[in-house]
């Protein structure tokens, strides 16, 4: 399976566009726990634990895109975009949301 952020694949011809595929990954977060754990990780304004969480979520979202594209008969996903955000649930925590979107295609 070819996955790319570009709208074309060099050297390949798109035979058919099979549709938009999306994947959503949601992680629960406990503000107090994450805040205390994050104190150890913060170096130069960066929080390693959250960076690893988002990196893992992006990988999982792309894997899910591939699975959904395969179900449509695709052998590639083009134009992939990944967005991240948070959803405030209540005062005790937030949900971390990672969304991936692309176009499932069959190429030769």
UniProtKB/Swiss-Prot annotation:
A Pfam family it matches: YbjQ_1
SUPFAM superfamilies: YbjQ-like
Superkingdom of the organism of origin: Bacteria
Lineage: Bacteria, Bacillati, Cyanobacteriota, Cyanophyceae, Nostocales
InterPro entries given in the database record: UPF0145_dom_sf (IPR035439), UPF0145_YbjQ-like (IPR002765)
The protein, known as: UPF0145 protein alr2488
Organism: Nostoc sp. (strain PCC 7120 / SAG 25.82 / UTEX 2576)
Family matches, as PANTHER family: UPF0145 PROTEIN YBJQ
Family named by the database record: Belongs to the UPF0145 family.
């Amino acid at each position: 399976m070819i996955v790319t952020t570009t709208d074309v694949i060099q050297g390949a011809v798109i035979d058919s566009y099979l549709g938009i595929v999306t994947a959503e990954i949601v992680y629960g977060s406990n503000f107090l726990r994450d805040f205390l754990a994050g104190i150890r990780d913060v170096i130069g304004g960066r929080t390693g634990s959250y960076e690893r969480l988002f990196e893992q979520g992006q990988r999982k979202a792309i894997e899910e895109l591939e699975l959904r594209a395969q179900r449509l008969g695709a052998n590639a996903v083009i134009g992939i975009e990944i967005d991240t955000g948070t959803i405030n649930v209540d005062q005790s925590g937030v949900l971390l949301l990672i969304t991936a979107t692309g176009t499932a295609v069959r190429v030769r």
